[in-house]
Structures are given as C-alpha cells and as structure tokens.
Amino acid sequence: MDYNVKDFGALGDGVSDDTAAIQAAIDAAYAAGGGTVYLPAGEYRVSGGEEPSDGCLTIKSNVYIVGAGMGETVIKLVDGWDQDVTGIVRSAYGEETSNFGMSDLTLDGNRDNTSGKVDGWFNGYIPGEDGADRDVTLERVEIREMSGYGFDPHEQTINLTIRDSVAHDNGLDGFVADFQIGGVFENNVSYNNDRHGFNIVTSTNDFVLSNNVAYGNGGAGLVIQRGSYDVAHPYGILIDGGAYYDNGLEGVQIKMAHDVTLQNAEIYGNGLYGVRVYGAEDVQILDNYIHDNSQSGSYAEILLQSYDDTAGVSGNFYTTTGTWIEGNTIVGSANSTYGIQERADGTDYSSLYANSVSNVQSGSVRLYGTNSVVSDLPGTGQQATLEGTTGNDTLTGSEAHETLLGLDGNDRLNGGAGNDILDGGAGRDNLTGGAGADLFRVSARTDSYRTDSASFNDLITDFDPAQDRIDLSALGFTGLGDGYNGTLAVVLNSAGTRTYLKSYEADAEGRRFEIALDGNFAGLLDDGNLIFERPVIEGDAGNNALLGTSAAETLLGHAGNDTLDGAGGDDILVGGAGRDTLTGGAGADLFRFDALSDSQRNYTTGDNQGDRIVDFSVGEDKLDVSALGFTGLGDGYNGTLAVVVNSAGDRTYVKSYETDADGYRFEFSLEGNYQDLGSESFVFATPSGQQLLEGSAGNDSLQGTAADEIVHGGAGRDTLSGGAGADVFRFSELTDSYRTASTSFADLITDFDLADDRIDLSGLGFSGLGDGYDGTLAVVVNSTGTRTYLKSYEANAAGERFEIALDGDLSAFTGANLILDERVVLEGSDGNDTLDGGSAAEELLGGAGNDSLDGGAGNDILDGGAGRDTLSGGSGSDIFRYDDALDSFRNYGTGVTGTDTITDFTPGEDLIDLSALGYTGLGDGYNGTLAVVLNGDGTRTYLKDRESDAEGNQFEIALDGDLVDRLDAGDFIFAEAAATTAIEVVGGTPTEEQLVA
C-alpha cells in the first residue's frame, strides 16, 4: 500500500518543516504491516531530534521510502541546524529492522547553512550486541552536502544492497560499509567527497563491490580496512570492475584485511599509489588497468607493505603475505617509481605473473621477500611453500597451489590438488603431483642420477603429459636424443611400466643424470612438457624480423638491419652487425653486444649503424658490454662509456668517444630519457686491477698474477701473494687475521710492495697507525728484520687481537698503505657555506652557519652542524646525521628558528641518524620520541620534540613534501630500537577515522 506524505500534511515547498508529516506516513505504513511512503517531486525540509541517534526520519521494518527521482524529490536539512544528526534517514537505534529501504530521491545535508556532524543514510544494530538489521535496499539515491558521511550502513547488517546511487560533496566518506555481511554495492558513483569515496570497514565480510566509480575524493577512491577498533578484519571482499581515479591518496587501499580480490578495474590519476596493500593477507589483484598514478610525488603504481600496529589498539605487527598479482596492465606516470614494489619490512610470498609493466622510472618490479616470485608466464598459483629438511621428509600439499621443496634426504612429496611445483632436491625422492597442472623441477644433475652399479633417481608417480611439465632448464641439456652430446634418451623398461629420461654421459664421479616416470610415455614426451635450455631464434645476413614468444629465448640477428622483439620471457637479444631495432618486451631482458662493430657510428662520414633499444626498463633489463672491454660509465674515454641525452630529451645515447682506425666508435641509443642511467644497468668487463681472489673459511693459499687484484683470504690462517701489479689485501672481519696471548692465527702477506700495494681495513674501525692502542695499529719488525707485523694490542672479549704478518722489513710502512675510510670529506667553515658533492660517496660537514649541502650522486653522509641548513642528498642512499640537538631546533617562546630542511628525503632509501641525540622512536614527541607533523597546506613534514631544553629550544627537522604516511622507524637510526606509535597529522586529513554513531 502507498502512503503519500502530502496526505499527512507534508508540503514539499522548500520552506516548511515536513519532518512530522513524513514520519507520520512512515509510522502509518509500519502500523499497517508495511508499505511504500511516497514523496512527490519537491523539496522537503526536515530537522533532527533531541539526540544525534534520533536522526531526522526513522524508517521501520517493511517500509520503503520512494521519491519521484534523484533531484526531483529532495529531503533537505533545515537552515541553521547546529546539532549532530546521525542519519537524516535512519533505522531505529537499538531495534532490529528488516526489509526496508529507499529509492529515487536526494538527501541534502545543507552543509553550507548548518553546523554539527550530519550523516545522510544510517542503519545498523547496536555495536557489539547480538542482532542485526536485515534485507536493506537503496536504489537511485543521491546523497550530497553532508558534513559527515553520505551512505553510512553502520554495524551489524545482513544483506544490504546499494545500487545506481550517487554520493558527492560530503565531509567524510561517500559510501561506508561498516560490519556488513553478505552485501552489495553496485553501479554507484562517489565523487568530490572530502575523504574516501568508498570505505569498507570493521569486520565487513562476504561483500561485493561491482562496477562502482570513485573520483575526485580527498582521500582514497576505495579503502578496505579494519578501522580503529581491535576487531576482526574485513574478509571475503570482491571488487569487480569500476574505476577509481583522480583521488587525493590511493586509488584503492587494502589495509588490515584478508581474502580480498580486486579485478577488472581501471585505476588511474591518483595522488599516491594506484593500489596499496597494507598489512593484508591473501589479496588478489587480477586483470586491472592501473596507470598514471603518483600524481603527488614519487610512488609505485602498486605497493605491498606491512603495517605496524604494535603501538596501536591491537599491539600487533601485520605482515603483508600471499599477495597474488596477475594479468594487470600497469603504465606509469612521469613520477611512478616501480610498477610493483614490495617494502623491505617482512612483506613476502608475493606472486607476480603475466603483468605488463611500462613507463616506470626505477624498474618494473622491486621484490624483497625471500619467497616472492615474478614471471611473465601465467601463474600456477603458488601462494605457499612447504620446505623439508636435510633428512627424509614427507610433504603433503592441499587443494591450493603450492611449492614443495624436499631438500636433502629421500623425500616423499605429494602436491595434492592445485597447480603445484615439486622439487625433490638431493636424494632419491618420490614425487606425486596430484590433481592439477604440476611442474616437476630438477635443479641439479646430482638431484637424480645413477652410476654403473646403483640408482639414485627420483620417481614421478603420476605424470600427465597433457598438463604436467618437467623443468630441466637448469641442467644444460639441449633436448631429446640418444643420451649423448647434451641430449636425453627416452627409455622404456621391458615390462612397459616405467619410462626413463636419461643421459649416458657421466661426470667425473661416474654419475649420469636419470629420472623415472611411472607408466609408458614412449612418444608422449616433447618440448610441450619438457623444459630444456633457452631456445635460440636466429636470423641470417639479411634484414631479419625475429619475434619471440612468452618463453625465455635468445634472439640472434647477425648481419643486416634487423628487428628483434623478445615478446614475453626473460630474453637475450643480440642484434649483431647492422643497424638493429631491439625490443625486449615483457620480462627481464638482456641486450648483448659481442663486437664493437655490432653498433657503431662514424661522425666523419655520417655512417650510422647504431642499434636502437625501444623499451629498456631500468632495474629489470640489462646492457651487456662485457665482451667489448668497457669497464664502467664515465666520459667515454679510457674504457668508459658516456651517457648523453639529446636536446629533445626523448633519446639517450650510450657512447664511446674513442674511434677505431676507420673512424668508427661504439654507440647505441635508448628511446626515452635515461640521464640517470647507472652502472647497475650494465654488465661491464672486469676492470683492470679489480680481479677478486676470494678465500674460504680454511687456511688458504692465494696467489695473484701480474694484474691488479683484490685479495681476500677470509677466515683461517691464510698465505697471500698479490703478484705483480697494484694489489689490495682486504680484511673485512677482525677474525680474518688475529692472534691470542698464546697462539697466532695471523695471515701472511708474502710480497707486499710499499710503492703499489695497500691493505684494506675500512670495515674494522681502525683510525690509523700508532702504538696499537686507542684504535690504532702498531708497525713492528722482528729482531732479524725478516718479518713485519701490523698489530693491535687491544683484544676483544674472546682475547683475540688483530694482527697481520708481512714478509720482509717494512718499517717504512705508512698510513698511505692503508685503506681506512674511502669516503671523501667536504668540510665547511663557521660561515654560510655551499658544499656540492660529486658522484662518489662523500661526507659533507657544514659546521656553523646557514649552510647548503648537496650530496649529488653516491651514498653520502650530510651533517649540517649548527645553523639553519638546507640539505639535499641527491641520488643514492644518503644519511642525514644530527650530532647535537641544537643543530636543528625551534624556540616557540622567542620565535627563533634554526630548523634544517631536508629537500629530497626518500623513505625506504635514505636515513636520518638521530642516534647521538638519544631519541628512541616515533611517537607523540614526549619521552624520547619524535612526533611526525604535517603543515596546514600539506607541503612540509616536521619531526618534532615537544619537550624543551632549559632555554626553551625544541629539536625539530623539516622535510619537504607530505611524508606522514610514508615514514616509519625503518627510516631512522635511533638510539635504541622502539616500536612505532601513532603519528599526528596537523592540518591534513587522516586516512582512517573511527566511525562513531
């Protein structure tokens, strides 16, 4: 039955207060057992009750409020209302309400003409009590201009649906789902809200978000999070389709939640990350288009990081694990660092498969997790690893996709259901894949072998040639054949019950590779189910077009102007002679040059045969020039290569300025601007003088050559000879060479040359030569003049004191023969200094005065000293060090400020060293902690001590940019480890707020 509010006295004239009339219609419908309350087109003014929880209008079971359409029927809060309203329309507080809803109208909070916190729609049962609202439906509802939340279904609700609705210009979130069970948000739009577009929070589970759109919101587009109570985390959330763009923070943030799937969405143009997974488990990110995020600074398109709540309401540290990222297209903006990045904070077991990543600045993928994997192929789904021991283990998988590692011993591995990877390791192993497409991996020839008299081969019990595979790529076999010349023979036993893959070529111990498969597989094994070494795609002397596949391949162009495209896989591309165009495609590709003439240019004749690399990805791809003798980057002379960007900034040349007899010099180009291209992107030849002779833990005898070598004996009593050349003898631990009161374990250097050789002690903390005390080393020659000792007389707790023996009388040994600290020191004065570092690792000491320090490239240490200093680390992992609390301070009483500004601090890479000042962690700025505070316009972050010294000075540092959500204890060197506590944001909008009725 329909109940028209005008029959109950409502006017809808935009002036009169229609609250009582509309409520009377609702009550009448409820009293009749249910019905539809109809509001014709018009503006209906309403007011709140005595308590915020009274709301304006209370909807009841079996009642639906229906208007004439969004924007046609408007329910608007009266002008001048100055109290909180927890729902202009809401279900009754403390009552279970069911089968109710609203459609085809607009709720207007009249934000500009009211005060107090006003929410639009609110429903839900008492938090923490038994009971729930049920079967709630909202369709085609617009909620606007609320000072609080738009849609706020809050606390226990079962089976809520909100579809085809809009929330905009609200003071907090557009849509909230707080402790919703089995609900749906479908085809909704949330825009221009002050905080998040959608906020799914507080134990919500089994919830679907389908084809929703969030844009232009001040916070994130969509957040899945626990909230600020210590309650069960959200789980079982499906985000399918939709778009999340142009939001101030992340496009999508998944925080303290588990079993969340994000798929088929477009996420772009957001201020921070496209997607951030933050202290969450078992998140799947599938088949999304994520692009052009990081609009407010340098961020990854997808970030995986753990969440430290040890100082929060739970006291727990939530590690991000089990993230599955597959089939996404990721295109960076000019600011995007990585396509996908893990933080080095315990985040692990991430699985990345078949993602396309392009146009990022630092690299496609950055993983720190020991068990995290990345591949260009579709994933088999390994989200757990079962690992054995050196003994005889039995490992049994589940229905999930797992990796089973037997290690040593005679192991029994059973993958169960799922697409599993089984690697028995050493020993005679029994391998059963179970259901699913399984991969049996052999990592060494001695993992499965036989001799002339005994068998130590593994047995695969259930190989399915239609879907299973055997990975032999690590063993160097080239394919099937007669078992000779690097091939494997397929041999069936006489009973036809067992098939062997075997080599007839034995190693020095008489071992030849062999693996057994239960069953008759004669004629069924081929390249489709056996993975051998990298295939080669080869051209000829003509102009070839070579196209790879999704597998890892080697493409050889040879002569001619070739076009090589690796497509997927970790490929090797060798253009050969001619002017070649090289595209690696997806994967970590290697572009290799085997001769100087492979890519060359003659500036006299104008002949350009330089190769062009179309899609080089820093941090993932490599440039191999090791065969050409180049030893590093530099000015293009003396065996170095110069990096030069053209005037348009769209092409980078890597070139030598040294020509051959015909006037040609080596040169190739990269499409794009790679002005910061570093040596880590290259495979260089070993520089002269840098060959490393490395010993073991035993008593080694290392003999150098005529080259310049680094000789490192390691532990044990070693005999070291550098040979001719300028050699460096390196000692990295005190126990590499030492003696006790009774016994010598000192290394002996037999041919130390005072003119050319040096001893590297830079890792041991010695300050120089002296009397052997106070961190110095004494030079002592024995009585016969046949041996010289470099020794310390200060012993450690075990009675060990450093000592080296050198053959001969080397009493002329000086500090110039020692390497104690290679870092160059640039030191200012008491005035206002400008110190500019170079490409090396340097220490910049400003001293007194208002100094400007710029580290340039290299891993630098910057210490501004007293005064109001400006510190820029430049590229590299830099340390900003403070030795005195008055090096950077503010006095709020006198108005005097001596606050340093760090212009380019990069969390996760740079460090701030406060260990000398006694601070123990981040916190509220009291009791030895520092508060993290954002200024009002969000452009500068402060580290503040709230406690003053006797003169009223408070230690304070300024960091350019909004780093509030990015700083944690790992970015600092404190006096002692301490848990990170909550951080304060001044003038900014937090990403999380306790939702309170």
From Swiss-Prot:
Source superkingdom: Bacteria
Pfam families tied to this protein: Beta_helix, HemolysinCabind, Pect-lyase_RHGA_epim, Peptidase_M10_C
Top EC group: isomerase
EC number: 5.1.3.37
Residue spans of the Hemolysin-type calcium-binding repeats: 388-403, 406-422, 424-439, 557-573, 574-590, 695-709, 712-729, 828-839, 846-862, 864-880
Single Gene Ontology BP annotation: alginic acid biosynthetic process
Keyword Nucleotide-binding among UniProt keywords: no
Catalyzed reactions: [(1->4)-beta-D-mannuronosyl](n) = [alginate](n)
Regulation affecting activity: Inhibited by zinc.
Cofactor (UniProt): Ca(2+)
Note: Each enzyme of this family of C5 epimerases introduces its own characteristic sequence distribution of G-blocks in their substrates, explaining the extensive sequence variability of alginates. These alginates of varying composition have different physical properties and are necessary at different stages of the bacterium life cycle.
Domain notes: Composed of one catalytically active A module and four R modules.
Homology family: Belongs to the D-mannuronate C5-epimerase family.
Protein name (record): Mannuronan C5-epimerase AlgE5
